[in-house]
Design a protein with these regions (language model features):
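Bacterial N-terminal signal peptides that target proteins for export
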Residues: 3-15
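Bacterial N-terminal signal peptides
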Residues: 14-23
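Sec/Tat signal peptide C-region and signal peptidase I cleavage site
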Residues: 26-30
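Gly/Pro-rich cap/lid or specificity-loop segments adjacent to the active site
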Residues: 31-309, 362, 368-502
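Charge-rich, solvent-exposed alpha-helical interaction surfaces
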Residues: 284, 288-291, 313, 330, ...
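Structural motif
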Residues: 295-312, 319-323, 350-358
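Short helix-capping/linker segments at secondary-structure and domain boundaries
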Residues: 318-336, 370-376, 486
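Long, low-complexity segments enriched in small/aliphatic residues
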Residues: 339-368, 372-379
Length: 502
């Protein structure tokens, strides 16, 4: 069974017999990471069928489940620990420090992060340890968010609202209310500081991607003097944290803009039967979605391919310009009633795991304030979001039942935990594609202005690119900033698709 997530929340959202038995309790101070080879037990099963590099080291870092308002230890209490799964790829020669990779999501694992070490990125590999970690509640960190329900306990013939409430109850029961209360971005920021201290670095050197840029920017607000060099790629606007609807609406508009560019490219290259005319392309895509909705296709394993699968695949493949040919093939084949091995592979590889889906939903909801909407406001917002990204909203009529986060009972309201620090950090570099559907370029422009930091604009379509080896201009600028952080002017690099959609 494929796990399909709401397209506007994708890019945008063990039983608690743990009770704390999986925690260590005590006082946290100057915790160390006991590094061991990742080839040894219990770490060898962290990576599934993929064998890690023999050089890769693994370990856990214990951090407090909850912090004081300033990130300190809570005295007088026996505070349970969370154990963060960590990896280290040691520097090849003289060690100068650690480069921490902060993953996106929320909910994406971050151990053994992918970096292309071709030149110029190889310069980092020589003298910097590459550090990855699974954030609290995610992946191999303990405890992990778990919202799964045994098949026998999943009720049939219930309303959508009841189905959401069942999942919420499973999240809280399996993970524990106290764990969930401290699973959000507020604690994740303080975890970064504990990681820096455990690594023995005087200041933080890091690259953050997508949602990880939210953590990095909040860290820069709270610990400006602890920043050495931090690159934020695919930028979240932290000033939108007090207005969830605004960032959702901005993201929806950006997705539609990217769809329009995809359709124009598709028509020009004759890759799929979409028109370069915006209205006509949306109409054609709606016809295909309706066709799949009423008469789903079937893959070689007997799995159904409906409109939900195409929407999920579309929102996934629109993110990267290099994936557009695959999306075009899917649109063309589905229009013809065909499902090739290539598209089956794309559908299966784009599936979001249940664990990632759980973590994304829970962390987003915990971070949001307790927002109770009237029926009129809820309908108005849903209509605005549907109008902003009309390509995937083909069904007539909108449901009026509350969304997952509106029904979610445990909130921390991340915006209320922010610190107004008058000191601006140096050493930040913001990176963004000009046409990024999920973290729009305007986010990066606003954050660069807020922190008086340079902005690297990639003139093209995509989402996150730093240190992947696919754009020499970007990698040179990022590596230069990481090795020798200094205030520079804004930078522009040409990216995939620049100028070829018109």
């Amino acid at each position: 069974m494929r796990v399909i997530m709401d397209p506007l929340r994708r890019t945008l959202m063990t039983l608690f017999l743990f009770l704390f038995s999986f925690f260590i309790s005590g006082t946290v101070s100057a915790q160390r990471i006991e590094w061991q080879s990742c080839m040894t037990s219990p770490y060898s099963d962290w990576f599934g069928v993929e064998s890690p590099s023999p050089e890769l080291l693994c370990g856990y870092l214990s951090v407090p489940l909850k912090y004081t308002d300033t990130g300190g230890d809570i005295s007088g209490e026996n505070i349970p620990f969370v154990r963060l799964a960590m990896t280290k790829l040691p520097a090849k020669s003289k060690h100068k420090g650690s480069l921490l990779i902060i993953s996106g999501g929320p909910g994406l694992p971050g151990i053994n992060p992918y970096i292309n070490f071709d030149w110029p990125v190889t310069n980092l590999r020589e003298s910097w340890d590459i550090i990855g970690f699974d954030p609290r509640g995610v992946g191999k960190s303990i405890p992990a968010i778990n919202c799964q329900q045994p098949d026998g306990k999943r009720s049939e013939n219930i309303t959508d609202k009841q189905r959401i409430l069942q999942r919420i109850n499973a999240c809280i029961h399996n993970t524990g209310a106290e764990v969930i209360r401290h699973i959000g971005s507020n604690e994740a920021v303080y975890d970064i500081e504990r990681i820096r201290q455990a690594l023995g670095d005087k200041q933080l050197t890091a690259v953050a991607y997508s949602y990880g840029t939210q953590i990095a920017a909040l860290y820069a607000e709270r610990f400006p003097s602890s920043i050495r060099s931090v690159v934020l790629d695919g930028v979240v606007d932290i000033d939108d944290l007090n207005d969830n609807f605004t960032w959702q609406l901005r993201q929806a508009h950006s997705y539609q803009e990217t769809f329009d560019r995809f359709a124009t490219w598709c028509a020009r290259t004759k890759s799929c039967p979409l028109s370069s005319d915006r209205i006509q392309a949306i109409h054609q895509f709606h016809e295909l979605l309706l066709k799949l909705h009423h008469s789903p296709l079937t893959d070689s394993r007997g799995e159904s391919i409906s409109s939900d699968e195409l929407i999920s695949l579309t929102t996934e493949l629109l993110l990267w310009r290099s994936s557009w040919p695959t999306l075009a093939t899917a649109v063309r084949q589905f229009s013809q009633g065909i499902v090739s091995n290539e598209i089956e592979t794309a559908l299966n590889s784009s599936i979001v795991s249940e664990e990632i889906s759980d973590a994304l939903g829970v962390i987003l909801c915990v971070d949001q304030g307790d927002e109770q909407l009237t029926l009129e406001v809820r309908k108005s917002r849903k209509k605005a979001l549907a109008d902003a990204f009309p390509a995937v909203n083909f069904k007539r009529g909108l449901s009026d039942f509350p969304e997952f986060c509106e029904l979610w009972p445990i909130h921390r309201d991340l915006n209320k935990t922010r610190l107004n620090n008058a000191v601006l950090p140096s050493g930040l570099l913001f990176v963004s594609h000009k046409y990024d559907p999920t973290t729009p370029w305007i986010n990066a422009r606003k954050m660069a202005d807020k922190f008086s930091a340079p902005l690297l604009t990639i003139n093209g379509d995509g989402h996150t690119l730093a240190l992947t080896g696919t754009n020499l201009c970007v990698d040179e600028a990022v590596v230069r900033h990481l090795l020798l952080p200094r205030k520079t002017e804004d930078i522009t690099c040409q990216g995939s698709g620049a100028g070829d959609t018109n």
